[in-house]
Structure formats: structure tokens, C-alpha cells
């Protein structure tokens, strides 16, 4: 009689091979999914509102949705690279706060992004910057996490803005008006009057309101 002890080896080896194949397939599928997600995200990021940003507390949210903790919806946005310790700070913050208060938060918002790449202008943490600006300048507009806007570590959302205008801000408080479609339509340097911005922003908001009335 032939010994049967060696026979179970083949099925066991075959089963182990099948498991390896299945694991390999699962890994490949997972890798493909991650790659597709990254590609989809990069393809989607064709406008400012396609990006994600962080607030001063480090919480992440997509710009295309409302910021629940700020109670805002991004439709028309004035994006500003701000700083707390410069000679233009108080003048610009007062003007931006006034504009933010005038237009409300239903269709228009001022979005402030602190940046410390222009000398020692923002040495504190994001939360310290937010607390200081609110207490000292009385701002209620949303202040986001401190970012870089120059170099390889530039914030992607801000890089979209600078790529759109083919210019890098030379100093703080450059202001960029973003349409409801997420495109940069105009920009202003820090010394330019806020009235020019007010006119452009009001025109965009008026178009939004008229369009919504027509859709009713």
C-alpha cells in the first residue's frame, strides 16, 4: 500500500498560492484606486474652490463647501495674504473688515491667509495670529492657517492664484478677487484704494443675485 501522508501537501501549497494571488490583486486594486483618486483630484483642481485649506486651528475643509465654523459660503471671495506686524496692517485690516461687514457673508467673503515670507511679519502660530488680529484689530473675517505662497512649499490654493495672474505678491496685503466660478478676475496691491475692490465685488454679487432671481 502506498503511503498517503504526502498527498495533502499539493492542495495546501495550491491554496497558499491562491491566497497570495488574491492579496496581490487586492493590493493592486487599492493602489489603482489611490492613483485614480489623486488623478481625479488634480484634474478637478481647475479653480480656486476645488482646493482644501486649513483654518487657524488646523481643521481641513474644501473651499467648494460652506465653512460651518465660519458660517460662510464661498461664492465671491477676496483672498488676501495678510500680516500682523507691518505698517500697512491696521489700514488694510480696517478696510477689509469694513468691506466684509458691508457685504455680509451670504455671497461675499474676505479670506485672510497669514504669510511670514515677507520679513518677520508673522512670527506667531496660526492661533496666536488669529487671536491677536481679532483682539487688536477687531476683525471678524475668517483667518486661515499660516501658509507659504512662494517656493516649492507654497499652499496649493494660493499657488493656483499666483499661477492665474502669473505674478508673485511682492509684499503683504495683495488682494485677489475670485469669481463664483473660482477664477481670479482681478487683483490689487496693498496701497490701492478699497473703493475699487468694493465696486468690482459689488458687481459680481449683483450678478449672482440677479441670476438666482431668474432661476426662481
Model regions and ranges:
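N-terminal "domain-start" segment that seeds a small globular fold
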Residues: 32-67, 88-91
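Short, internal strand/loop/helix patches
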Residues: 127-172
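Short, low-complexity, Lys/Arg-enriched N-terminal segments of secretory-pathway carbohydrate enzymes
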Residues: 1-15
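Thiol-/selenol-based redox modules, centered on thioredoxin-like
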Residues: 156-216
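Hydrophobic membrane-insertion alpha-helices, especially the h-region
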Residues: 19-34
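Conserved helix-turn-beta segment immediately C-terminal to the redox Cys motif
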Residues: 70, 74-76, 85-114, 133-137
